[in-house]
A protein has these predicted regions:
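Flavin (primarily FAD) cofactor-binding/catalytic cores of flavoenzymes
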Residues: 2-235
Length: 235
């Protein structure tokens, strides 16, 4: 690991609640930035159970403050050296490199990424809270879709719903984290249903006017005069 030590406290777990899920997107840009910048600085540990599944093995090792310097392929595996001069031979390597949320670095959307609004376009943090990683996040609409940087230039980008880690900065950790992903999926479905309905409003308006299936058929009651009555029940 590049880190010098394993983080031990999951700060966001400590404040996890339905209020956070519902309330985070409603916070100001300043507060959302402050929350996630603080969490980035504190760093997030691996789950305890996952860590124990590795450490219980005699050949499970944790190396801190070191990165891979060179990798060479051989017939039956790989040879790599670290920045501390260690040489290791392995069958394979799994690289946990994290996420890159910058639209300009995503091949699928790179051709039109210049017109996708990012956090750096909407918010400038105060001194000491700068974070290039946070600044590169897309700035989303409430339905997980992109926003245009220059409105009207590529309006179709707002029809791309990005339900993944890229939505974290704008809408919270609801698209890839176990405690809230079900909330996020339901949220996305509601937002898309609302959007489809509003786009088809002329059709629904016509259907409203054309609907003529009676709820009552006329034989469910008999018209009558209202009898005189008093509060003691006598009539």
């Amino acid at each position: 690991a590049r880190r010098d030590a394993m983080p031990q406290i999951n700060k966001m777990m400590g404040i996890g609640s339905p209020g956070l899920v519902a309330g985070f997107p409603a916070l100001s840009d300043e507060w959302r930035w402050r929350y996630l910048h603080y969490n980035n600085v504190a760093q997030t540990p691996a789950p305890r159970s996952s860590t124990l599944r590795v450490s219980r093995h005699a050949n499970g090792y944790f190396h801190f403050g070191v990165t891979i310097d060179q990798v060479k392929e051989k017939a039956d595996g790989l040879i790599f050296t670290t920045t501390k001069g260690r040489r290791l031979e392995t069958d394979f390597i799994i690289l946990g490199t994290g996420f890159d949320t910058d639209p300009h670095r995503q091949p699928v959307i790179e051709p039109y990424a210049d017109n996708i609004l990012q956090w750096r376009d909407r918010y400038t943090p105060p001194p000491g809270l700068e974070d290039e990683g946070l600044a590169s996040f897309p700035y989303f609409n409430s339905d997980f879709s992109f926003k245009e940087r220059n409105v009207g230039q590529t309006p179709w980008v707002e029809r791309i719903h990005c339900f993944n880690y890229g939505s974290k900065m704008s809408l919270g950790n609801v698209s890839g984290d176990i405690p809230a992903i079900s909330d996020g999926a339901a949220w996305l479905a509601r937002e898309m249903a609302a959007r489809f309905y509003s786009e088809d409003i002329e059709h629904h308006w016509q259907y409203l006017q054309d609907y003529d299936t009676p709820e009552l058929r006329g034989g469910e009651w008999t018209p009558s005069d209202l009898p005189n009555s008093t509060l003691d029940g006598e009539s």
